[in-house]
């Protein structure tokens, strides 16, 4: 017994170590959050060398990746069998898990791939395979567009193109707005086609300049706002990919596209910071349909598309937008619509721009801001207070018994007489809606512009339930739609001091209201990508939002804007050449 007890005590540490090792081996770690080019399920990445990222998860501290293995396959079935029939990286000894370059054979344009990852920790333990992720490659060259053409409703007026913008400042001898800009009408275009077999996968690739909205069988495709992202359109334009598999019908289908001006063409008539034009609104489009039997079909933009004026009668990225609901042609984006009064689209050049996939997250309606109070101004107009200053547009809900025009005047401030004040934000800016006037409830919101505002002054209508001797349209509701870049929120802040919380909220609203497809200086007066904002705010914003794709786009804008002598101007995209005091100065860019 004297010898047995010391022997038992000597074995206890060994037993403890053995049990500990078993516990360590039982501890779990896994791989998740797979991304390609910082996007979870991209539909159109550049086929040449996409970069892959993932996160390591563990139930203990200090778990580090020591190696990884990536499988890329051309079908979910192959990937489920652990068959990387496109690329098997093998076991790679590396702790890298962010933007790992794809190292397999060249990927094909316009194809779908799937991939997964497993990792090893520092102790040599291997994780399970991650859940599969998907990636789609974009269109690498114009040949991949299968003959798609740039089309428009009317040809460019080359003599009135004005590539370099003017700022509207007065100089000796008169204003610099001395060059007219063509009064292009805003088009809608349509095309019918037939899906002849069961569909496996269908994608739409589209670029509409300056902005576009796409419709399939009468419904808007996607939830994006102000597509595509702003670029220097004489050099580069970005196309957007949509998965339309679920929207296609067996048999007859119809695709429709509405075009807005955006930063492609800034018309006269209202407030504008810059005056320039790249030409008439235009678009290029390819629908790629893959059938279950392995065959394929493409529908491309050409002069067989039909074109007509849209109900959007005025649109300016600066000055606002007008819409005439009495001019709506019901069913125009549905199969069977009678378009005999329409005309064929015209072929146009598209200025020979380079087409690349959209880089940043799209803009979207990210929040609805209801009216908190309303009051009457001295001029008799009604003013709606949303209680929050934000970037976005107005959603109007109204009822009218005859076609009448309603003017919505947005602003951040109000005057002493309670009318909206636009002195510091740029004016005149307004949204105008002409009702159908059939007695039903109508709802409308601008499609191709936005502003920064808290108040909305309504001219030509009264709130429902108020005295209405003039039989004006009755406003049922005014709601603010906050639009911004849809970069995901990744951080939060809260503390015990209400003042700090309020300061954080104030700054956060300012940041998100200036997150467009560039980081703007303001959401109304200029809307330009001043690069000092990108530089000074980036380090802070990344703690609140995932701006990786937005900043990739901004860097691309800087590269495109760079001059031959190496100088990067203070704004990118460079829509205007400022004076020497502003074009190259560190405090502004």
Residue ranges with predicted function:
Residues 25, 333, 581-589:
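Short, intrinsically disordered, charge-balanced linker/junction segments flanking boundaries
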Residues 1-30:
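Bacterial Sec-dependent N-terminal signal peptides
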Residues 531-542, 548-552, 585-589:
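Well-ordered alpha-helical segments within folded domains of soluble proteins
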Residues 29-112, 116-525, 532-533, 549-552, ...:
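Extracellular/oxidizing-compartment recognition motifs
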């Amino acid at each position: 017994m004297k010898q047995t007890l010391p022997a038992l005590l000597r074995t206890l540490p060994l037993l403890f170590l053995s049990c500990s090792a078993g516990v360590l081996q039982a501890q779990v770690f896994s791989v998740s959050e797979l991304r390609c080019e910082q996007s979870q399920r991209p539909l159109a990445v550049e086929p040449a060398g996409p970069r892959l990222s993932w996160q390591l998860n563990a139930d203990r501290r200090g778990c580090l990746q020591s190696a990884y293995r990536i499988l890329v396959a051309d079908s979910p079935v192959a990937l489920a069998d652990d068959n990387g029939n496109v690329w098997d990286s093998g076991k790679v000894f590396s702790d890298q898990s962010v933007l790992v370059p794809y190292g397999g054979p060249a990927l094909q344009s316009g194809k779908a791939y799937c991939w997964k990852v497993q990792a090893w920790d520092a102790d040599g333990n291997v994780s399970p395979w991650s859940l599969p992720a998907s990636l789609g490659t974009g269109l690498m060259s114009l040949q991949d567009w299968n003959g798609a053409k740039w089309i428009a409703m009317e040809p460019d007026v080359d003599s009135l193109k004005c590539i370099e913008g003017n700022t509207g400042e007065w100089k000796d001898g008169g204003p610099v707005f001395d060059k007219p800009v063509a009064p292009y009408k805003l088009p809608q275009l349509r095309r019918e086609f037939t899906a002849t077999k069961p569909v496996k996968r269908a994608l739409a690739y589209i670029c509409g300049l300056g902005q576009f909205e796409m419709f399939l069988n009468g419904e808007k495709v996607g939830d994006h706002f102000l597509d595509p992202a702003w670029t220097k359109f004489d050099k580069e334009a970005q196309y957007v990919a949509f998965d339309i598999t679920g929207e296609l019908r067996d048999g007859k289908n119809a695709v429709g596209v509405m075009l807005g001006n955006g930063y492609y063409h800034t018309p006269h008539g209202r407030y504008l910071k810059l005056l320039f034009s790249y030409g008439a609104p235009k678009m290029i489009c390819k629908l790629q349909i893959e059938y279950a039997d392995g065959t394929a079909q493409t529908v491309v933009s050409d002069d067989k598309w039909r074109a007509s004026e849209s109900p959007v009668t005025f649109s300016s990225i600066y000055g606002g937008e007008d819409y005439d609901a009495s001019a709506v042609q019901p069913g125009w984006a549905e199969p069977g619509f009678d378009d005999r009064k329409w005309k064929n689209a015209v072929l146009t050049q598209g200025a020979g721009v380079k087409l690349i996939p959209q880089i940043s997250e799209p803009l979207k309606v990210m929040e609805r801001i209801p009216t908190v109070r309303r009051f009457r101004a001295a001029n008799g107009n009604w003013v709606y207070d949303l209680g929050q200053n934000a970037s976005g547009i107005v959603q109007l809900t109204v009822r009218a018994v005859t076609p009448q025009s309603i003017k919505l005047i947005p602003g951040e401030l109000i005057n002493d007489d309670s009318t909206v004040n636009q002195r510091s934000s740029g004016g005149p800016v307004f949204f105008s809606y002409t009702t159908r006037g059939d007695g039903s409830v109508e709802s409308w919101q601008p499609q191709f512009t936005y502003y920064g505002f808290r108040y909305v002054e309504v001219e030509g209508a009264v709130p429902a339930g108020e005295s209405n001797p003039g039989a004006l349209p009755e406003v049922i509701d005014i709601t603010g739609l906050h639009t911004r870049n849809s970069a995901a929120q990744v951080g939060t802040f809260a503390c015990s001091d209400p003042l700090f919380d309020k300061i954080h909220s104030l700054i956060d609203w300012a940041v998100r209201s200036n997150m467009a497809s560039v980081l703007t200086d303001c959401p109304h007066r200029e809307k330009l990508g001043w690069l000092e904002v990108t530089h000074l705010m980036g380090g802070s914003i990344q703690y609140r939002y995932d701006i990786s794709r937005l900043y990739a786009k901004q860097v691309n804008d800087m590269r495109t804007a760079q001059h031959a002598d190496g100088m990067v101007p203070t704004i990118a995209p460079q829509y205007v050449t400022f004076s020497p005091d502003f074009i190259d100065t560190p405090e502004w860019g």
